[in-house]
């Protein structure tokens, strides 16, 4: 059996979920596929949603903390505080619930979704792209007029069509903790070779917990990772 769609979106994160929903609203037949068995897992980012993006999806009830400012620490320990309590800079959200809601809205608009599914091949023909998708252990053939890759930094779509790779790769490490001394509405940013060689580290209040992480180049972290 061949499954035919106007558009296939690979990756059911917030971008893939939002894109597929908007396309379905425009009366396109859309298939959204996700390699994991559930939406929002694994959690792979700091969980910040800027005001413009939040306004588009309207999922304010998924927010854990409203961020309006920051405490920034220089390599020498000097602290600079910025922000205005009256101006929201970003929202710290529960990514699992946020992602699920974005995808649920897409499905409500008519999107089909296959979980535990990942593409095995995609060949461009004159009028369509023919894909073989492993869907929970069963191979399915899909034909689509448009294939969209929303599958992240290690995109299968990018690799399959040899669309190049980023000139520079960085790595992020993060842990969620309790007991960190935060200031209401402010996140912390740290710079310096001792704490974040090559870039910066952060501490983001997220309701009753704090997400502490670092962004750097793998070769610079060494034993620090």
Question: Could you describe each region identified by the protein language model?
Answer:
Residues 1-13:
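Beta1/beta-strand and adjacent pyrophosphate-binding region of the FAD-binding site
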Residues 8, 21-43:
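Glycine-rich FAD pyrophosphate-binding loop
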Residues 11, 34, 74, 216:
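Short beta-strand/turn micro-motifs composed of small residues
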Residues 12, 26, 105-225:
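Predominantly flavin-linked oxidoreductase catalytic cores and closely associated redox partners
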Residues 47-51, 166:
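Short, hinge-like loop/turn segments at secondary-structure boundaries
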Residues 50-103:
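A conserved beta-strand/loop capping segment in the N-terminal third of enzymes
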Residues 16-17:
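N-terminal Rossmann-fold NAD(P) dinucleotide-binding loop
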């Amino acid at each position: 059996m061949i499954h035919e769609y106007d558009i296939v979106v690979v990756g059911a994160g917030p971008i893939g979920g939002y894109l597929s929903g908007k396309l379905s609203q425009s009366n396109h037949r859309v298939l959204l596929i996700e390699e994991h068995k559930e939406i929002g897992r694994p959690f792979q980012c700091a969980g910040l949603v800027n005001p413009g993006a939040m306004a588009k999806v309207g999922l304010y009830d998924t927010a854990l903390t409203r961020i309006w400012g920051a405490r920034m620490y220089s390599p020498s320990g000097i602290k600079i505080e910025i922000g205005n309590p009256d101006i929201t800079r970003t929202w710290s959200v529960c990514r699992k619930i946020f992602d699920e809601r974005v995808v649920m809205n897409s499905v409500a608009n008519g999107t089909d979704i296959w979980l535990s599914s990942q593409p095995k091949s995609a060949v461009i023909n004159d009028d369509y792209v023919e894909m073989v998708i492993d869907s929970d252990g069963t191979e399915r053939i899909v034909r689509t007029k448009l294939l969209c890759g929303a599958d992240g930094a290690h995109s299968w779509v990018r690799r399959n069509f040899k669309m190049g790779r980023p000139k520079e790769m960085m790595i992020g490490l993060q842990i969620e903790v309790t007991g960190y001394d935060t200031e209401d509405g402010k996140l912390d940013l740290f710079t310096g070779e001792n704490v974040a060689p090559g870039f910066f580290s952060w501490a983001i209040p997220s309701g009753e917990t704090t997400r502490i992480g670092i962004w750097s180049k793998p070769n610079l972290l060494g034993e620090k990772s």
